[in-house]
Amino acid sequence: DFIFAHHPAMFVPVKKFDLDVPQNAMYAKLIKHDITVYGAHTNLDNANGGMNDWLAEQLGLENTEFLLPTKVDPVSNEKYSMGRVGELKDSLTAVEFAEYCKKVLNLRGLRLIAADNQKPVKRVAVLGGSGGRFFNAALLHKVDAYVTGDISYHTGHDMIAAGLTVVDAGHHIESICKPKLTDKFKKWNNENDWKIDIYQSKLNTDPFQFI
């Protein structure tokens, strides 16, 4: 009846409803079966206890703070922002940190951007999704390493020139939200006696393979 997704089903506007286009065929199928799709995208990224807090927790970061400038929610009066900055319990080299990220984020592969593979990493920034344009914010926080995804070739050169170690763990690390949201929804379901059947998707939507 209802799909809760992180990325919106309709990312690009539909100008012609041609069912030969796979995305349009998917929309038609959803409508035909009366399925509602809700996408919590940047609001989940910004939320306290949301995407970037989950990633920071998975990386074992302590004493976390916001990466980007904060805003204030007009209802709760809570500050919120995208990205987190924190510290590892123990210092690692750049290569060791990349291997650590691969392990704790359950990745088949990742990309490391580093001028010095032996540079110590202790203070870390993380931002789920495509965070290349925010690397200057990581520099302002004087971090040793930045974990994000979708880094372009030229941005990678800019990062090396700035002396910033970056782990491009890919966009798919945001799939961490599936078990987190499932647990949250089941908790609300029990607390409110909603009697809703909740299922966690088992699909792997990462388009990339590592050879």
Regions found by a protein language model. Name each.
Residues 1-211:
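Hydrophobic structural segments
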